């Protein structure tokens, strides 16, 4: 065995398989320890210890295992976990999935080196999420409100415009009447070059890049890198939020690619698979990402998460959206039917939900009538959708005058409330006023979910 005790350098690689390599005869190696690898050609790569069994270590190589062999590859265990150097200079910069600048700018001079796995928030130190975050999108602001410190995922499908929606939220999101700075951290995992170019062009064209920090893992980058990309982003978010009192919105896309990377690594390790081949610990792994959102008592800053995931075959019961739903505080669901009608953003408000909405709306936060308007819009749109199904069976002639008004409401709701331009930034006032305009299409006797004193104040044409 050829071992340098001081540097813990080994040349005892016994197997190379996929993204993994097995090193024998190791001593004092720890789980998640960072490894430096020197290829036979002298190229330097990095990896991480996945598993330790007696004198054997399983290492995942971030840059892939091509050109590595079992004879001359050198392995050095650093004794440290994966870290990222953080600084406020990261604002407006673009990094790859491992935290290296890829925008042609200078290297970041770090103010701190932080472990990318973070440290869990003490539940007793958490402050309940509150304070409205305005995204400029009516279906979110008006009916599925995002609040500061919440984790609210977007469930999409293949071919739906979740990338456009993510870019729009990154551009427009803001906390109203707050002096603290607002920042966006955008982490992309497994996206194509075309998608990456779209995001970069959009951020640069609109000037949003000034307040956005981007971490980009592309589809042809190693799958292993996808596991650390969101952790790099969240560690940076924690630094901005809890060291510099900033309100940080973290957008993670696409968590489905992240989970596929988890499955790939699990298969390479020959672990016993869980549901649909995903590892049994996927729930715990996702929770280690989602639970890094929140607010801490005594700290001004906050981390709000909007993870985006593409549901395979639009199946909301698939393990990825299913497990995500257990951990997060609601969901925004994109609809293929609305997309076929040419509606953008195709948010289906009926299965969508923000569980923490009540803490972020109302007088002093948005407007006194917000809750009632939202409930009434939900109720009326749900009835209009039911009547569409009924009309398909019995015909329009069988509907009453009241039924026709609800049908018209559902159509107008989709055309005017859900639909908006890709660069349209609606204020919460505009969203609520539009809601009242649509409610004016219904008989006043049907407005049972809004407070009576709000009707003459906000309903157009009311006395």
UniProtKB/Swiss-Prot annotation:
Molecular function terms, GO-annotated: ATP binding; proton-transporting ATP synthase activity, rotational mechanism
Subunit text: Has multiple subunits with at least A(3), B(3), C, D, E, F, H, I and proteolipid K(x).
Name of the protein this chain belongs to: A-type ATP synthase subunit B
InterPro entries given in the database record: ATP-synt_VA_C, ATPase_a/bsu_AS, ATPase_A1-cplx_bsu, ATPase_F1/V1/A1_a/bsu_N, ATPase_F1/V1/A1_a/bsu_N_sf, ATPase_F1/V1/A1_a/bsu_nucl-bd, P-loop_NTPase, V-ATPase_su_B/beta
Alphabetized Pfam families for the sequence: ATP-synt_ab, ATP-synt_ab_N, ATP-synt_VA_C
Subcellular location: Cell membrane
Keyword Transmembrane attributed: no
Similarity remark: Belongs to the ATPase alpha/beta chains family.
Taxonomic superkingdom: Archaea
Cellular component per GO, a single term: proton-transporting two-sector ATPase complex, catalytic domain
Keywords per UniProt: ATP synthesis, Cell membrane, Hydrogen ion transport, Ion transport, Membrane, Transport
């Amino acid at each position: 065995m050829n071992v340098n005790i001081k540097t813990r350098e080994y040349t005892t690689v016994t197997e190379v398989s996929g993204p993994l390599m097995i090193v024998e005869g190791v001593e004092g190696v720890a789980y998640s320890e960072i490894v430096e690898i020197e290829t036979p050609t002298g190229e330097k790569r990095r990896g991480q210890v996945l598993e330790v069994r007696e004198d054997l270590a399983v290492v995942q190589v971030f840059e892939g295992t091509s050109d590595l062999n079992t004879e001359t590859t050198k392995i050095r265990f650093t004794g440290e976990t994966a870290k990222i150097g953080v600084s406020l200079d990261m604002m407006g910069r673009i990094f790859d999935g491992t935290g290296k600048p890829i925008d042609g700018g200078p290297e970041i001079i770090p103010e701190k080196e932080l472990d990318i796995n973070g440290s869990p928030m003490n539940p007793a130190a958490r402050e309940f999420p509150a304070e409205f975050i305005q995204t400029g999108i009516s279906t979110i602001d008006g009916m599925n409100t995002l609040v500061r410190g919440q984790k609210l995922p977007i469930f999409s499908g293949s071919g739906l415009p979740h990338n456009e929606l993510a870019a729009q939220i990154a551009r427009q999101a803001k906390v109203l009447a707050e002096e603290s700075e607002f920042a966006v951290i955008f982490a992309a995992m497994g996206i194509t070059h075309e998608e990456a170019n779209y995001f970069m062009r959009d951020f640069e064209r609109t000037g949003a890049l000034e307040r956005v920090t981007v971490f980009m893992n592309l589809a042809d980058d190693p799958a292993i890198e996808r596991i650390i990309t969101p952790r790099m982003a969240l560690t940076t978010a924690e630094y901005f939020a809890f060291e510099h009192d900033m309100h940080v919105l973290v957008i993670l896309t696409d968590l489905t690619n992240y989970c596929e990377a988890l499955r790939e690594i699990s298969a390479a390790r020959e672990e016993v698979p869980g549901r649909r081949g995903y590892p049994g610990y996927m729930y715990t792994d996702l929770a280690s990402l989602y639970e890094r959102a929140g607010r801490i008592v005594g700290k001004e800053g906050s981390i709000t998460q909007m993870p985006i995931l593409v549901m395979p075959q639009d199946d909301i019961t698939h393990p990825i959206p299913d497990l995500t739903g257990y951990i997060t505080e609601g969901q925004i669901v994109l609809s293929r039917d609305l997309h076929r009608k040419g509606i953008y953003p195709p948010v289906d408000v009926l299965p969508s939900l923000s569980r923490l909405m009540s803490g972020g709306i109302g007088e002093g936060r948005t407007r006194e009538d917000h809750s009632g308007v939202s409930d009434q819009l939900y109720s009326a749109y749900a009835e209009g959708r039911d009547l569409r199904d009924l009309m398909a069976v019995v015909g329009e002639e069988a509907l009453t005058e009241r039924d026709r008004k609800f049908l018209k409401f559902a159509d107008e709701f989709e055309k005017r409330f859900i639909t908006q331009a890709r660069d349209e930034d609606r204020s919460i006032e505009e969203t609520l006023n539009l809601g009242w305009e649509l409610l004016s299409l219904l008989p006043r006797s049907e407005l049972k979910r809004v407070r009576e004193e709000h009707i003459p104040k906000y309903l157009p044409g009311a006395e």
